[in-house]
Amino acid sequence: MASGNRKVTIQLVDDGAGTGAGGPQLFKGQNYEAIRRACLDSGILFRDPCFPAGPDALGYDKLGPDSEKAKGVEWKRPHEFCAEPQFICEDMSRTDVCQGSLGNCWLLAAAASLTLYPRLLYRVVPPGQGFQDGYAGVFHFQLWQFGRWVDVVVDDKLPVREGKLMFVRSEQRNEFWAPLLEKAYAKLHGSYEVMRGGHMNEAFVDFTGGVGEVLYLRQNTPGVFAALRHALAKESLVGATALSDRGEIRTDEGLVKGHAYSVTGTHKMSLGFTKVRLLRLRNPWGRVEWSGPWSDSCPRWDMLPSEWRDALLVKKEDGEFWMELQDFLTHFNTVQICSLSPEVLGPSPAGGGWHIHIFQGRWVRGFNSGGSQPSAENFWTNPQFRLTLLEPDEEEDDDDEEGPWGGWGAAGARGPARGGRVPKCTVLLSLIQRNRRCLRAKGLTYLTVGFHVFQIPEELLDLWDSPRSRALLPGLLRADRSVFCARRDVSRRCRLPPGHYLVVPSASRVGDEADFTLRIFSERSHTAVEIDDVISADLDALQAPYKPLELELAQLFLELAGEEEELNALQLQTLISIALEPARANTRTPGEIGLRTCEQLVQCFGRGQRLSLHHFQELWGHLMSWQATFDKFDEDASGTMNSCELRLALTAAGFHLNNQLTQSLTSRYRDSRLRVDFERFVGCAARLTCIFRHCCQHLDGGEGVVCLTHKQWSEVATFS
């Protein structure tokens, strides 16, 4: 076994090229200004080669090329069916967004909410665009995608049927910022049809880079009004949904179940001895409004002073209406709130800095997709992130009822923590599935995902620095957890005492594969790191202890080698097959070592394409060591190990690898049954031996730290 006392360590350093000044990433490499200048110089309007105006841009099923809805569709530029098109007529407002025939109310309700805050809107819809001077048929929008902003360029050819826009339109028929934004979103995800069905928080996050939260409503949910009032005051985007199992259904009161509404305002007042709490909502259809109490035509408005009535009530079929809180709780099931990201908000109101950590990861079948049950056999394989909360929140004195997130909705002044309460830290965790909407055309949809939060006791802290501690996970106390649901974004606002925690994001089912982004927010100081290992190898793993060959084995080598006294790969395969025969008789390490693996062994331990007796002696020492390690993890003597255990087996063999490298190895060396046999294990260990020996050439004495750029390491450790 490897002693682990002397090591060679690979330290990865930045390549030095940098990633620019942090500006938006150009989607498909398209630069808006460069395209616009080229089109103006040539006098030819832009046609987008990356998202051609045609059947494929519409969709793949109900909007597919042969579908009924795609018949008669023409792609036209605004000036071809509108006399005086404008990008923006005066100012953008929430009535600019009216839904068309596409079931993307979730996206449009979010866009309508965005118009309430010009500072946010102009980040998504860059100013200075139009159909007059400098018009070249090209527009651009900026959308947040999984940790950074992306600049998306589109041409202005829009789907039109019978002279009218098929999808989103503005109340002002000559205004086109909303249809072009919708097209940019369609391009980002592959087609218009993939936007059918969704949740407002998905669009909220893409428009702001914020964190979406879902509040599930009941008739007696406390603090909803305070939370919504506080959220809108903080420029959060807010939406509400009346759930339905049968699609969009209109109720007798003028609401649409299964439909997304924007929440755009709140108002609290007293009528006599009665407190009235009103919410302003908007249907993105731009029509079909609430007809119950406090609707546009309700006589209750006549009870108000004229100045109140004039300030609040606009009698117009624009989809916007007021309703009382109790009616809201009766008819709506969920509220979706998007808290803005530190980048958008800037410094916190208290003057301190915002703290955010972003991690990119992936669940891989047979490696780290261990399911959602902490007691399950493979749960420990899931990605893990260590979170340390250092400073508790300051206590808030509520001036209203307790908010639904433990006072989150309160707007009172901050004060010192009151006696008897355990100080706690507020941390917002956000888990996002990456790029799943783009895969709808292939029949894939969102996985059921979520996360657990476990507390790490002080006595185990020193052990929790590498994946070797994963076996301790089942014994930890769970401090919190999110819901597990089939949404792109799953978030939870946690209130935890200062201390050390383990965040474990997972898919619900073992073996589900997806890319994910985990974000951790707090106003107070915290640290967060992925549980990972430093890439290193014990020198004992690279230098097998000298042990003379058995006479019979040495004689067999010489017989096969002939006069040259060296073996090629085919001869080595024969020799190993004969030598391992006793092991196969005991059903340990069954099967043959293939020719390709033998070629790899010759390359690693020999010179050129040949293997001398001395080299074979070294190779045989490694093979015996690897066989002992393999047998330890082949507990049922089946000749295979679970691919999830490959990392543990490699660690036992003296190789300590980070998550990315282990994932690459697992994907390469597992079979279709997620098993690793002895030959695959030998090939993997030989490859690692070769890599680390190559790195040791840069060291005096073969021990110490080798610094490589990511590009250099990629060249050395390519597993394709």
Curated annotation (Swiss-Prot):
InterPro entries: C2_III (IPR033883), Calpain_cysteine_protease (IPR022684), Calpain_domain_III (IPR022682), Calpain_III (IPR022683), Calpain_III_sf (IPR036213), EF-hand-dom_pair (IPR011992), EF_Hand_1_Ca_BS (IPR018247), EF_hand_dom (IPR002048)
EF-hand domain: residues covered: 621-656
Active site residues of this protein: C105, H259, N283
Record's keyword terms, sorted: Calcium, Hydrolase, Metal-binding, Protease, Thiol protease
Annotated segments matching region Domain III: 342-541
Binding site for Ca(2+): D634, D636, S638, T640, E645
Region (Domain IV): 542-720
PROSITE patterns assigned to the protein according to its UniProt record, in alphabetical order: CALPAIN_CAT, EF_HAND_1, EF_HAND_2, THIOL_PROTEASE_CYS
Amino acid composition bias (Acidic residues), ranges on this chain: 393-403
GO biological process: proteolysis
Stretches assigned to the Calpain catalytic domain: 45-341
Renumbered residue ranges of the record's region Disordered: 393-415
CDD domains linked to this entry: Calpain_III, CysPc
GO MF entries: calcium ion binding; calcium-dependent cysteine-type endopeptidase activity
Entry superkingdom: Eukaryota
Record-given protein name: Calpain-12
SMART domains the UniProt entry points to: calpain_III (SM00720), CysPc (SM00230)
Pfam families referenced in this protein's UniProt entry, alphabetically: Calpain_III (PF01067), Peptidase_C2 (PF00648)
Functional summary from the UniProt entry: Calcium-regulated non-lysosomal thiol-protease.
E.C. number: 3.4.22.-
Tissue expression pattern: Expression localized to the cortex of the hair follicle during the anagen phase of hair cycle.
Disulfide bonds: none
Family note: Belongs to the peptidase C2 family.
